[in-house]
Curated annotation (Swiss-Prot):
Residues 109-121 have a biased composition (Pro residues). The keyword Nucleus applies. Belongs to the ETS family. This is DNA-binding protein D-ETS-6.
Length: 475
């Protein structure tokens, strides 16, 4: 009975329970619907803001460290934004402030990249370069003082003059000082062709010959016009000048066949065996067997004959040193340009014993002294002029054919300009040496006479400086 009563009570309570469940179910549906509709506004906004704050917490800490390194103000603002993330309104404000500061956070990153290379840093490196170049150029044309009279030059003066002219006129290739004579008298005896051979180039020989002729003129008052013109010496003169150097060089050491032939041609006593034909570099073996015998003696080859000698000569055809003259027996012709190239190559090879451009002791008879061919006119120091005193000022006028010009191509006055100034013959005689101060002789311009010239000291001052030095100053 008790069981039945309990079952009845449970049946009675079922509608009540179902009603309770039904009412509870009906009350939660609008709550769920409201939750779904207003999730982002009321219930979910705080949670989402907190999630966003947590997500931005890590990069905020990183940015805070960067801002802390850069400036204290930025670190304070990052700390305040971090503390305001506890509330919904504070989190939205901090997130907006962070977004507004994001562009500013990127600004310090490129700035340090540009600061190490300011424009002022490169200027100190660029400024010294022109000063270095100017100092090098000043050193390259530093003044050189030598005696007024080239006849009084020492070997050191000759070397200083060659070095100065090389730098001043930018001679290329640079002349070898050892090619020039060490004696002043021998240097004064050089012809224009000798200067070509000493310089080793056309331009170098022309400029050195012209400048030295000017120095001789200012010392002696005598013009050396053949050394001042721009006409090239004929091949005979050049080859003959080179052959005289080989004679002065001596017979020791290794020597090439073409050098040996030039040695024989330089001595007129060998005319019965070999001689020049004309003045174009052509020569003829008068006695080819005698020439071959002498060549065998020089090379210590007693079996030498003309057949072997001619085969050796054919080797020079491809080198453009010499050629065979067709239609003439035992006749050959030197090619000066190929010969000079061979001389320069041999000199650069460091074999002074076999180089015709090696150490020079001028031939006692002077350059171009052959019996059948007179040498070109050049200055002879033994020819004196009583009205010219050494060291007196003279103005060179090498181009008499152009009186309208006030300055020659070398930078000195022409005859019309010189005639209006003090004449060499009118200059007072002086027993003491005077000076001539040359300032860049080849740079052009007219020369002036220093009015402060006295009877005891006369000077041709080209920069109107003091008249006290006793030397030529090549600037």
């Amino acid at each position: 009975m008790a069981i039945l009563q309990n079952s009845r009570q449970s049946h009675k309570q079922l509608p009540i329970i179902s009603q309770t469940i039904r009412s509870a179910w009906c009350q939660q549906r609008p709550i769920n619907a409201m939750h779904q509709d207003v999730r982002q506004k009321s219930i979910g906004s705080g949670n989402e803001t907190k999630l966003e704050a947590k997500e931005t917490e890590v990069p905020t800490n990183r940015r805070r460290r960067r801002r802390r390194c850069s400036s204290s103000s930025t670190s304070d603002s990052s700390a305040s934004s971090y503390s305001s993330t506890d509330s919904d309104s504070g989190s939205s404000t901090s997130s907006s402030s962070i977004r507004s500061q994001l562009p500013a956070l990127n600004l310090p990153v490129p700035l340090p990249l540009a600061t190490p290379t300011p424009p002022a840093v490169s200027s100190p490196h660029q400024a010294p370069s022109p000063r270095r170049n100017s100092s090098d150029s000043n050193r390259s044309v530093s003044p050189v003082e030598v005696p007024v009279d080239p006849h009084a030059w020492t070997p050191e003066d000759i070397a200083s003059w060659v070095r100065w002219a090389t730098r001043k006129f930018k001679l290329d290739p640079e002349p070898d000082i050892d090619r020039f004579p060490k004696d002043a008298q021998e240097l004064c005896d050089l012809s224009r062709a000798d200067f070509w051979v000493c310089a080793g180039s056309r331009r170098g020989g022309m400029l050195l010959a012209q400048h030295f002729a000017i120095s001789l003129y200012h010392a002696t008052g005598r013009e050396t016009s053949p050394m001042l013109n721009d006409d090239e010496p004929n091949p005979y003169q050049l080859l003959n000048a080179a052959s005289h150097r080989l004679v002065a060089q001596g017979s020791g050491g290794q020597i090439q066949l073409w050098q040996f032939l030039l040695e024989l041609l330089a001595d007129s006593s060998n005319a019965n065996a070999i001689s020049w034909e004309g003045q174009s570099g052509e020569f003829r073996l008068i006695d080819p067997d005698e020439v071959a015998r002498r060549w065998g003696e020089r090379k210590a080859k007693p079996n030498m004959n003309y057949d072997k000698l001619s085969r050796a000569l054919r080797y020079y055809y491809d080198k453009n040193i010499m050629t065979k003259v067709h239609g003439k027996r035992y006749a050959y012709k030197f090619d000066f340009h190929g010969l000079m190239a061979a001389c320069q190559a041999q000199a650069q090879g460091g074999d002074p014993a076999s180089s015709m451009l090696g150490s020079y002791n001028h031939h006692a008879g002077g350059a171009m002294q052959l019996g059948r061919h007179p040498p070109p006119l050049h200055h002879h120091p033994q020819h004196s002029h009583p009205h010219h005193q050494l060291g007196q000022p003279h103005f060179l006028h090498p181009h008499h054919s152009s009186p309208a010009s006030n300055s020659s191509s070398l930078g000195f006055p022409s005859s019309s300009t010189a005639s209006s100034q003090a004449s060499p013959g009118q200059a007072p005689a002086s027993s003491s040496a005077s000076t001539s101060n040359f300032t860049a002789p080849f740079q052009g311009g007219t020369a002036g006479v220093d009015p402060a010239r006295t009877s005891t000291s006369s000077a041709g001052n080209y920069d109107q400086g003091p008249v006290t030095p006793t030397t030529n100053a090549f600037n």
